[in-house]
Design a protein with these regions (language model features):
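Membrane-embedded alpha-helical bundles of multi-pass enzymes
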Residues: 2-227, 494, 505-508, 519-520, ...
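Class I S-adenosylmethionine
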Residues: 215-217, 256, 484
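CN hydrolase (nitrilase-like) catalytic-core segments centered on the catalytic cysteine
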Residues: 99-102, 129, 277-278, 283-285, ...
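Active-site catalytic loop in hydrolytic enzyme cores
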Residues: 84-90, 137-169, 353-469, 558-587, ...
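Soluble catalytic regions of membrane-associated enzymes that act on cell-envelope
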Residues: 220-416, 450-455, 459-476, 501, ...
Length: 647
């Protein structure tokens, strides 16, 4: 077999200093490229040192090859996800080790294939196919941790990946690795390229990056008219209020009186004025609401009574400049809740992998991390014999419409113990974040489920689920016209964790071309438009001066409200002063006006969004078909470049 470029690179000399640089450099580059750092384009060269290490490993032992690459991958994981330590030290160590080992698999398999005599493909392009398969699989097993999916890196540059509505994050991963391969080969072709300018040497990777940037700008412009419906006579405005109660999950959330917390959050919700839907964060209702009779729960009953009595009509006087789609009647609510499902079982073993036995051995129960959708309804009864003569009416509370969804993408180690069906002893190793919240394997929905009615259905995305683009697609297929993320991000303290989590929601907005509204108990609450632009956001513990690391809001209510008469430049300036980003793309300022109020230490963010039932190419294809297209493309490139013996 003739010598090829891949064979020649094996002769490159690797001294100790070069090896050390290649081990530590990827961690530095990925740290600078990942949110919240602002140097995202560095991902286009961050993998080049890994390719150098892989080339060095071809001429050394398996042990040395694994050790060096594993160390480099571990440093990458530490530099970008070290903050998991604040939630669980044991969990963080296990995650870092396991994730680094899994990342090594594409390298190890590529090395094994290259050593086979029958191997005739270009190893680098084949490596991309293997990495794509690794990412796809890592989204779909019991120890799933796709936080460092390469395509997530562009959450800091949403303007560049408007084409995610076609490919999703897998397309971003393929682009990043392809550019890295081209950069690597340009660097390795020293003899033929030494006398060329760097622009000529790197013209192909630069050209590809530029083409995707231009494509993104064009797609963004096309989507902008649709997103804000500038040319449509049929607008569907929908006003949403997102609450950020700022309860410390360790010292307050599961310790304070649940009913008092509900009353406080209801009062904060009232301050926001009229709304179509009110959004409360994950586990806002902490008393394990019975799946069989949620309307009978004291907290749920209180909320329905509260909004039947204090609906938007009572709050509209102070907000006459705001238009919203619900003319009268109480708003719907989407609220995070702990739920419990009781059932009897006298058979052998456990009735379900998530089942727990009560003190009465006949009865079992399953705990859930859930989202409740509540639509209070008013039952009107006339007083007197003739209801048609404008006689005084009295209202009585009806149960209303209550729907719920149980979180399906569970956090490994805390909400789901891996492989407990075959290794049941692992159930005892559950990591508890605190002494009151549920741990161990939780019950879950079999599929994603949109909640609500008709054209205003919502995707109830609970915390960890928001990093799964393909799973979010299932909500939209079920009829969701907007995305709600309810979460509690304070487990990680004030670290990059909650910022990355918020930023990933921008990618979900682009993939589905849907508005995203985020309600965080602590962390970042806000609104993201279908182009991935943040139109309004809060800060870490914003409203609690003793905890907030950002500029605190003025204590006056409605300080964040801007009327239609104010200029866009003034809005941007004032919102930036508050530490809040605002987008100026809304066609009708009265409909899109943002408002933020503060009651005590709690915040209420409100804005009018536009609903749509549009399904993107990504939503229709799904990760499976996109993976097949990308892997086939990489295999063809691998074959072509090996046969041509050059790039």
């Amino acid at each position: 077999m003739e010598a090829t470029q891949n064979d020649r690179t094996a002769d490159v000399k690797f001294n100790r200093l070069k090896l050390i640089v290649c081990v530590f450099l990827p961690a530095l580059l990925f740290w600078l490229a990942w949110e919240p750092m602002p140097f995202t384009p560095l991902v286009f060269i961050a993998f080049v040192p890994f390719f150098y290490l892989a080339e060095w490993g071809r001429s050394t032992s398996k042990g040395k090859n694994f050790g060096v690459l594993f160390l480099a991958l571990m440093l990458w994981n530490i530099s970008t996800t070290w903050w998991v330590w604040f939630a669980s030290d044991v969990g963080a160590i296990a995650m870092l080790i396991l994730n680094s080992m899994l990342m090594y698999l594409p390298f190890g398999l590529s090395r094994w294939l290259q050593r086979k005599k029958w191997f005739i493909w270009d190893a680098k392009w084949l490596f991309i196919a293997l990495w794509l398969l690794y990412e796809y699989g890592h989204h779909r097993w019991d120890l799933s941790w796709p936080w460092l999916t390469l395509g997530n890196a562009f959450s800091g540059m949403p303007w560049y990946v408007q084409w995610y509505e076609i490919t999703g994050t897998l397309g971003g991963t393929a682009l990043i690795l392809s550019v890295n391969v081209l950069v690597y080969h340009a660097l390795m072709n020293d003899q033929s390229n030494a006398k060329r300018s760097w622009i000529m040497r790197f013209r192909l990777p630069i050209g590809i990056v530029s083409v995707f940037g231009i494509l993104s700008v064009l797609l963004g412009q096309l989507a902008s008219d649709f997103v804000y419906q500038k040319k449509s006579k049929l607008k569907q405005p929908y006003r949403v209020v997102a609450i950020q109660p700022n309860y410390d999950p360790y010292d307050e959330k599961f310790v304070l009186d649940p009913m008092q917390m509900v009353r406080d959050m209801a009062k904060t919700s009232d301050s926001a004025g009229p709304a179509d839907c009110i959004l409360w964060p994950e586990t806002s209702l902490v008393g394990n609401i019975d799946v069989g009779s949620p309307a009978q729960d004291m907290q749920v009953s209180y909320l329905m009574h509260h909004w039947l009595k204090n609906g938007p009509a009572d709050n509209a006087a102070g907000d006459s400049s705001l238009n919203h789609s619900r003319a009268a009647g109480p708003p719907s609510m989407l609220i995070g809740s702990n739920m419990i499902h009781w059932y009897s079982w006298m058979g052998k073993g456990k009735p379900d992998v998530a089942a727990r036995q009560s003190s009465n051995l006949e009865y079992w129960y399953t705990l859930h991390n859930s989202a409740l959708w509540i639509q209070p309804e008013l039952s009107i009864h006339p007083i007197g014999s003739d209801p048609f003569k404008h006689e005084r009416l009295r209202g009585s509370m009806a149960t209303g419409d209550i729907q719920f969804y149980h979180k399906s993408k569970l956090v490994p180690g805390t909400e789901q113990l891996p492989f407990v069906t075959v290794l049941p002893f692992l159930e005892r190793l559950a990591i508890s974040l605190d002494e009151n919240s549920a741990s161990g394997t939780l019950g879950k929905n079999a599929t994603a489920k949109a909640l609500g009615v008709s054209n205003s259905k919502v995707a109830p995305i609970i915390c960890y689920e928001s990093i799964y683009g393909d799973y979010v697609s299932e909500y939209v297929k079920d009829g969701a016209s907007w995305l709600a993320v309810i979460t509690n991000d304070a487990w990680w303290n004030n670290t990059p964790g909650h910022k990355q989590h918020f930023s990933y929601a921008k990618l979900r907005a682009i993939e589905q071309r849907k508005w995203v509204v985020r309600s965080a108990n602590t962390g970042i609450s806000g609104f993201i438009d279908p182009l991935g632009n943040t139109t309004m956001r809060s800060g870490w513990y914003q409203g609690r001066d003793e905890r907030s690391a950002e500029v605190a809001l003025n204590k006056h209510l409605d300080d964040g409200f801007f009327s239609a008469g104010e200029s866009g430049s003034k809005r941007s300036y004032e919102w930036n002063i508050l530490g809040i980003k605002y987008g100026n793309k809304l066609e009708d300022n009265s409909l899109g006006a943002t408002k933020i109020t503060q009651v005590g230490t709690q915040l209420a963010l409100s804005q009018t969004i536009y609903l749509n039932q549009y399904r993107t190419v990504y939503n229709r294809l799904g990760d499976g078909k996109i993976l097949a297209i990308l892997v086939l493309s990489m295999l063809l490139l691998s074959w072509f470049n090996r046969k041509q013996k050059q790039f």
